[in-house]
Each structure stands twice: as structure tokens, then as C-alpha cells.
């Protein structure tokens, strides 16, 4: 008799979203969760299938998943994602798009369940080893991980692929076979198809031993988290930036550990040792009058006022003007800068009937702002207000006609100050 144990100790939430590709692993997971729901009628179970559009069979896989979910009475969400070349490689990009879709689909109070198993854990460990990862990377996957404000659960992580297949055959489950899984040009497929069978032939318990090593690495990381918690608290500001002064007296090893944890808190990719060295040498230790910047995909690390900042890369908008003909409705800004709106109640005067409204990102001449004596150029105001250089040509400036009224969240000009109680506020949702 085939025994398969779903780690139900993870299932404290009664609302579960199961990732369902239609393959063997996710079919077994969904079947197990359906059985769990039968024993616990208060459980709400949904499934999500991601249509990557990479295979000519993708549409038929959707139909298969719909059929299975209809039979098991599981509501199914199908999300279609578009994969553009972002330099990450197709595997990494597909994974990124997949998890972004998961995060957007999760409902309040719902947890995400995925079907990774012991063999997957072994593959993940070996891929991290190939990259030269330290204990954090070698920790591989946890059974429970924070994700999108909730939890990502892997209830099958202790089970082997062979056990899952035996369970599926015994219960007459049907699943799809993704032809790309047979392409050993992909690193993970190479391990699964060629390397691991040889290792397991010599050492049958190799995956279980690797999983134990991953667990030990994870324990070491948790211990480091505890030991470095006080240092991390001292270094991180209320804005989430990293103060450099405490790092200057630390050993290289301790400083690197703090940098890694700060980046993890900012949801940054795990940096390599070379990347950490570049952050320190090229950004943190750049000359005082420099504005150093190091790019990581669509993000960058900058230094300002003796702090490190992890920010989204945005092109300067100093030549951009966005007309706002209907100022009573929100206005979308370019370059992913969000939206602005004018809401009742505030210290800005409303535009007069003859005044056109626009958003710009530069302002010439001498400006007079509320709360300051004398006039200043915009560059001087940015400096006085502590606005980082990269925000100075991406912060929305509200104009009525050719008159600057306000900078979102920073200042109001005297010409823009409300003259009565009918004022408005400029709200920027970045």
C-alpha cells in the first residue's frame, strides 16, 4: 500500500489556493487537499493554473485542469502571463511571472500551497551549490515561507517523486506531461534526468541526506538572524535605508551578513559575494561628492546622506509635461510613477476657471514656498528638504498655467496656498 503524508500541520488556514499546473506533482497535491477538505468541511479550496504560452499544448492543458477541477468541485482561476526577455533566462522569468500571478490572485486570509517535493529540494540545493551559494542559498526551500503578506506552504516537501507517482497510479489520477521537462538543456532537468539517477543508484538516500543538509543550513541562518538582530536594528532607518556609519567598524564577514539581511528585507535577489563587494566598494565607499549607483535588473542601490537605498530604477522626467484637463479625477503618471489626485480639504487653492492644470518635473526661476523666508531655486529647496537626487526629477510638480503650486508631499508655494477653507490636497500614490 502506498503511503503519502500531507504535512497537515502546515494547514492552519482554512482558505487555501493550490498552484495547479496539471502535472503529476500538483495533481497529487490537489487530490490530497480535496481529501483534506472532505474531512474538514470548513476548508475553502481554490486552484490556480498559469498559462505561460510557451508550449503549443498550453490551451489543452487549461482544458485538462478545468476538467479535473470541475470533477473535484474546486474553483479554478486561469491566469495568462506574458513573458518578455528581461535577461533572467526563460526559467527564471517564467517563475517570476508565475509567482507574481499567484500574489495577485490570493484573497485575504488565503495561503498558497505548492507541490514541491523531496527530489525538488535536492535539485534546488544542488543548483545553489553550483552557483557557489552560502548557507542562505543552501537552505533551499522551507515548508513554510512568507509570501505576498501571507504564507507559501509546501506540504509535500518530505515526499519523493516516486511516492507521488505511486499514489497517483493507485488512485487513478490523470496528469499532463510537459514536453519541456525532457529537455536537459535546462539545468534542473539535467539534474533530474541525468545526474540524480546516478547519485541515487550509488547512494539511494542521497535526496534525504541533501534535505538534512539544507535543514542544517536553514538552522544556521536562523541562528545568525537572532545574533545579528540587534546590529540590524541599529543600522536600519525608519525609511528602510541602511546607515553606513555602524558598518564601518565591522569585520568584512559581519558587514556582508548585515548587507544580505537588509537586501532580503527589501525583497532583493540574493546577492553574490562579488555583488556585495561591489556594493561596498563602488557605492558605500565612493568619494563624498559622488552620486554612486549600482544597477540590479530594474532596481538599483544608491548612497545618499551616508545611507544605502534600494530603489526602483526610473528614468528622469525633467522634460515631461502631463496635461490634467479634468483635475477632479486621478491622473496617471509616466514611467510607472503612479497616480496623483486633488482631494478636498487641504492647503492648496483650487485652480481658477481660466487656469490649465498640469504635472511637470522641473521648475525654473526663484520660488517662494510656504514656511520659508526669501526665495530659492528648486535645486536648493530639494537639498534643504533632504530629497535624494534621483527623486528630484521624478517628484510630481503641480502647475496651474505657468505657476508652480506644489511639489507632491514636499512643499506648497505662496502662489498655491489656499485663501479660504475650500482648499485641496495633492495626493501622490507612487
UniProtKB/Swiss-Prot annotation:
InterPro entries: Lysidine-tRNA-synth_C (IPR012796), Rossmann-like_a/b/a_fold (IPR014729), TilS/TtcA_N (IPR011063), tRNA_Ile_lys_synt (IPR012094), tRNA_Ile_lys_synt_N (IPR012795), tRNA_Ile_lys_synt_subst-bd (IPR015262). Coiled coil: none annotated. ATP binds at residues 21-26. Belongs to the tRNA(Ile)-lysidine synthase family. This is tRNA(Ile)-lysidine synthase. PANTHER family: TRNA(ILE)-LYSIDINE SYNTHASE-RELATED. One of its GO terms (biological process) is tRNA modification. Signal peptide: none annotated. Its main location: cytoplasm. It catalyses: cytidine(34) in tRNA(Ile2) + L-lysine + ATP = lysidine(34) in tRNA(Ile2) + AMP + diphosphate + H(+). Ligates lysine onto the cytidine present at position 34 of the AUA codon-specific tRNA(Ile) that contains the anticodon CAU, in an ATP-dependent manner. Cytidine is converted to lysidine, thus changing the amino acid specificity of the tRNA from methionine to isoleucine. CDD domains: TilS_N (cd01992). GO terms for molecular function: ATP binding; tRNA(Ile)-lysidine synthase activity. GO terms for cellular component: cytoplasm. SUPFAM superfamilies: Adenine nucleotide alpha hydrolases-like (SSF52402), MesJ substrate recognition domain-like (SSF82829), PheT/TilS domain (SSF56037). Keywords: ATP-binding, Cytoplasm, Ligase, Nucleotide-binding, tRNA processing. Its EC number is 6.3.4.19. The N-terminal region contains the highly conserved SGGXDS motif, predicted to be a P-loop motif involved in ATP binding. It is found in: Cytoplasm. NCBIfam families: lysidine_TilS_C (TIGR02433), lysidine_TilS_N (TIGR02432), PRK10660.1 (NF007942). It comes from Salmonella paratyphi B (strain ATCC BAA-1250 / SPB7).
Amino acid at each position: 500500500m502506498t503511503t503519502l503524508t500531507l504535512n497537515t500541520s502546515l494547514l492552519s488556514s482554512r482558505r487555501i489556493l493550490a498552484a495547479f499546473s496539471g502535472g503529476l506533482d500538483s495533481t497529487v497535491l490537489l487530490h490530497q487537499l480535496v481529501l483534506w477538505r472532505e474531512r474538514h468541511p470548513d476548508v475553502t479550496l481554490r486552484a490556480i493554473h498559469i498559462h505561460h504560452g510557451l508550449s503549443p499544448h498550453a490551451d489543452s492543458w487549461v482544458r485538462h485542469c478545468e476538467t479535473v477541477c470541475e470533477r473535484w468541485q474546486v474553483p479554478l482561476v486561469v491566469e495568462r502571463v506574458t513573458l518578455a526577455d528581461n535577461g533572467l533566462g526563460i526559467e527564471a522569468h517564467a517563475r517570476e511571472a508565475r509567482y507574481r500571478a499567484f500574489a495577485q490572485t490570493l484573497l485575504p486570509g488565503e495561503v498558497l500551497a505548492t507541490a514541491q517535493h523531496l527530489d525538488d529540494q535536492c535539485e534546488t540545493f544542488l543548483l545553489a551549490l553550483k552557483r557557489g551559494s552560502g548557507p542562505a542559498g543552501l537552505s533551499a526551500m522551507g515548508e513554510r515561507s512568507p509570501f505576498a503578506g501571507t504564507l507559501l506552504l509546501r506540504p509535500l516537501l518530505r515526499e519523493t517523486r516516486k511516492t507521488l507517482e505511486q499514489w497517483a497510479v493507485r488512485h487513478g489520477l490523470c496528469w499532463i506531461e510537459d514536453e519541456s521537462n525532457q529537455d536537459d538543456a535546462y539545468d534542473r532537468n539535467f539534474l533530474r534526468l541525468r545526474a540524480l539517477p546516478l547519485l541515487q543508484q550509488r547512494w539511494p538516500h542521497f535526496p534525504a541526506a541533501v534535505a538534512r543538509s539544507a535543514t542544517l543550513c536553514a538552522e544556521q541562518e536562523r541562528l545568525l538572524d537572532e545574533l545579528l538582530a540587534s546590529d540590524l536594528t541599529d543600522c536600519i532607518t525608519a525609511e528602510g535605508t541602511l546607515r553606513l556609519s555602524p558598518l564601518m567598524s565591522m569585520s568584512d564577514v559581519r558587514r556582508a551578513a548585515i548587507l544580505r539581511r537588509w537586501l532580503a528585507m527589501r525583497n532583493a535577489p540574493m546577492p553574490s559575494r562579488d555583488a556585495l563587494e561591489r556594493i561596498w566598494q563602488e557605492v558605500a565607499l565612493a568619494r563624498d561628492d559622488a552620486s554612486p549607483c549600482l544597477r540590479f535588473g530594474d532596481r538599483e542601490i544608491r548612497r545618499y546622506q551616508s545611507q544605502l537605498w534600494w530603489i526602483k530604477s526610473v528614468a528622469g522626467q525633467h522634460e515631461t509635461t502631463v496635461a490634467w484637463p479634468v483635475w477632479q479625477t486621478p491622473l496617471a503618471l509616466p514611467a510607472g510613477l503612479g497616480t496623483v489626485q486633488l482631494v478636498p480639504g487641504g492647503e492648496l487653492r483650487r485652480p481658477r476657471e481660466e487656469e490649465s492644470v498640469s504635472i511637470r518635473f522641473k521648475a525654473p526661476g526663484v520660488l517662494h514656498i510656504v514656511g520659508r523666508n526669501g526665495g530659492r531655486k528648486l535645486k536648493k529647496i530639494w537639498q534643504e528638504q533632504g530629497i535624494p537626487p534621483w527623486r528630484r526629477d521624478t517628484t510630481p510638480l503641480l502647475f496651474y498655467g505657468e505657476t508652480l503650486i506644489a511639489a507632491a508631499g514636499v512643499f506648497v508655494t505662496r502662489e498655491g496656498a489656499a485663501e479660504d477653507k475650500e482648499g485641496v490636497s495633492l495626493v501622490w500614490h507612487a
